Amino acid sequence: MKFSTDRIITTHAGSLPRPPELLKLIRAKVAGQPHDEKGLEAEITSSIEQCVKRQADIGLDVISDGEFSKPSFLSYIVERLDGVTPTDEPFGQPWKGSREHNQWSEYYAWEAQVGIALAPVTATKRVVCSGPVKYKGHDKVKADIARFKAALGKVKVEEAFLPAISPTQVEFWIRNQHYKSERDYIFALADALHDEYKAITDSGLLLQIDDPRLVTQYVMDASMSIADCRKWAEVRVEALNHALRDIPEDKIRYHTCYSIDMGPRTNDMEAKDIVDIILKIKAIAYSFEGANPRHEHEWKVWNAAKLPQHKVLIPGVITHSTVLVEHPELVCDRILRYAQGLGRERVIAGADCGFGTFAGMQTIHPTVAWAKLEALVEGARMASRQLWGRAAA
């Protein structure tokens, strides 16, 4: 993976706003309505090509396919696994009963009435693990890779990455009804997902592991203490590292965040309580929230953490948690805090979270999301001028 050797390079968290026509076709497929599968595939290909070009045009260095082939960053995995069964049971509201919902129930009731009008395009029924888990998505991940690399062949960027879901997140999404223990289940998922991870890195692309649940378990399960969550997280990190076996560390970036909730967020697990466990994950780079009001101050925690010398951080310097477009000078200041603590070569400028995590659920309008990414690029150029004493390329 490339580092910021002569300037601060830029990236983001993976998902980007999907075009309206693509959303329409994805919505029809997820709803089980008649749709043109060939037309959908063609639209995915065209949309990825446009997305890749736009990322390159605004100056992003390390880019993704926008996750345009997936209804969401996690539900896509259901059709890539054997041993899972959809049910008629509603998935429900995962935030209900969480620490956040319990403290701010009046706010969330109000938000439900006046908040986001667009429902996410994703499965609303519970999926269960009903048998041995095996990966069967080889053709689908090959198609993702082929589409992305075809689009990359038409632009000039530093590197490219494909996101893939973590075993821990799948464990949350697909309820275990087959394995005797949580440990057996999470390691079975790790074995299955290894195939997807290795296919991505074998193609020459970087792999990004998407793992919000590692830090959201604390807020989601009000019965667990910090100590409980740390013990729980240790097992999940062990399983993830098992899934990443025989994959070169320098091909892996790890992303965690506190979800797309735009609520008060006063119950988020603090970085100081989990950073040492995160750094046990086999990855060359760690992407995390660093630009929103609940976590911006944690640059001090990350700078003080014992990050191995050969690894880098990808702090969020723009955020999905507000529609305000960050001023490039603010982006620059955020980058400088990390660079002054870790060294300029060990910082890559990133985003807190994706801007299209669930197709159709847009807390940030596409025009605003792209403006934020432009501010990210300009802020990185400003930081580069200060850190290297010359204009960035």
Residue spans of the language-model regions?
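Domain-level signal for soluble alpha/beta catalytic cores
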Residues: 1-393
